[in-house]
C-alpha cells in the first residue's frame, strides 16, 4: 500500500467505537451512500446461493447486543458493564448508554452475547439480541 493509505489505516485503527460510528455517518452524508444498504446486499447473497430454505433452518451464530433501556437508578452500573464490554472510555460509554436503544456490541458469538445480556440485565438494563 502507499504511505497515504497506510496513514489513513493507522488513523482508523485508533478510533473509538463512537468515533467510528460518527465517521460512517459523515461518509454516508458526504458521498450519498448508505452502509446499511451495502451490508444488506452482501448478507442477502449467501442466502440466495444456498436456495433460501437452508439458510432459514440454520441457527444464527452472530448476534448484535442492543441496550433497549435501563432503570434511571441503575445508570452507573449499566455504564460500567457497557465500558467493560466495549472497552470505550467513560465519555463514549456514557454517550452510548444515554442514546438507548443502541447497539453496544455487533457480531458477538452466542455465548458472549448471552453473557453480556445477563450482566447488563443483572444491574438493571433491558437488552435484546438481534
Swiss-Prot record:
**Keyword field:** Ribonucleoprotein, Ribosomal protein
Tell me a GO biological process for this protein: translation
- Record-linked InterPro entries: Ribosomal_bL12, Ribosomal_bL12_C, Ribosomal_bL12_C/ClpS-like, Ribosomal_bL12_oligo, Ribosomal_bL12_oligo_N_sf
Task: Extract the SUPFAM superfamilies matched here.
Answer: ClpS-like, Ribosomal protein L7/12, oligomerisation (N-terminal) domain
Offer an example of a GO molecular function term for this protein.
Answer: structural constituent of ribosome
The record ties this protein, via Pfam families, to: Ribosomal_L12 (PF00542), Ribosomal_L12_N (PF16320)
Recorded GO cellular component terms are:
cytosolic large ribosomal subunit
The record's annotation in PANTHER family points to: 39S RIBOSOMAL PROTEIN L12, LARGE RIBOSOMAL SUBUNIT PROTEIN BL12M
NCBIfam families from the xrefs?
Answer: L12
What exactly does this protein do? Answer: Forms part of the ribosomal stalk which helps the ribosome interact with GTP-bound translation factors. Is thus essential for accurate translation.
Q: How does it assemble?
A: Homodimer. Part of the ribosomal stalk of the 50S ribosomal subunit. Forms a multimeric L10(L12)X complex, where L10 forms an elongated spine to which 2 to 4 L12 dimers bind in a sequential fashion. Binds GTP-bound translation factors.
- Into which family does the record put it? Belongs to the bacterial ribosomal protein bL12 family.
Q: Mind telling me what this protein is named?
A: Large ribosomal subunit protein bL12
Instruction: Please give the organism.
Output: Prochlorococcus marinus (strain SARG / CCMP1375 / SS120)
